[in-house]
């Protein structure tokens, strides 16, 4: 089951953080079709946010066709976003882990590492040059 985290200082709405975390878990194959999401009560207890925030996130997931609420049962994943070849990329993951280690050794904090990766990825995909 997914464990949510909310960073109230991130500038990203808490409900969107929940939505993004579910989407990421779906892309990585950590959540699959038929899996049940935590109940609103469980999420509220876990991350100390308003129940309406969780409901808004779950409604957004339903709107995107990624989840469906079943009255009296909970909210369930309805489709996956996982790339079927993602599991075959263990070598890439290992290389990325090494790269992150080098970045940390160089003194970069998590936000700087994320920014560097995102900027490099954007330049490569948008501009065609890293």
Regions found by a protein language model. Name each.
Residues 36-47:
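A short alpha-helical element within helix-turn-helix/winged-helix DNA-binding domains
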Residues 22, 58-59:
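Short, hydrophobic-biased segments on the C-terminal half of alpha helices
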Residues 1-36, 90-94, 100-130:
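Extreme N-terminal segment that seeds HTH/winged-HTH DNA-binding domains in transcriptional regulators
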Residues 36-37, 69-77, 81:
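Short, Lys/Arg-rich nucleic-acid/phosphate-binding segment
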Residues 45, 62-63:
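Alpha-helical residues within the helix-turn-helix
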């Amino acid at each position: 089951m997914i464990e949510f985290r909310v960073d109230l200082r991130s500038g990203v709405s808490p409900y969107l953080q929940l939505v993004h975390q579910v989407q990421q878990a779906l892309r990585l194959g950590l959540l699959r079709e038929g899996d049940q999401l935590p109940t609103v009560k469980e999420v509220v207890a876990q991350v100390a946010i308003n129940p309406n925030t969780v409901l808004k996130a779950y409604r957004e997931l339903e709107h995107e066709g990624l989840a469906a609420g079943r009255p009296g049962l909970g909210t369930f994943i309805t489709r996956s976003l996982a790339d079927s070849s993602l599991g075959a990329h263990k070598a890439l993951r290992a290389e990325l882990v090494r790269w992150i280690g080098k970045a940390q050794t160089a003194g970069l904090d998590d936000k700087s590492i994320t920014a560097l990766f995102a900027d490099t990825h954007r330049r490569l995909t948008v501009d065609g040059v890293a």
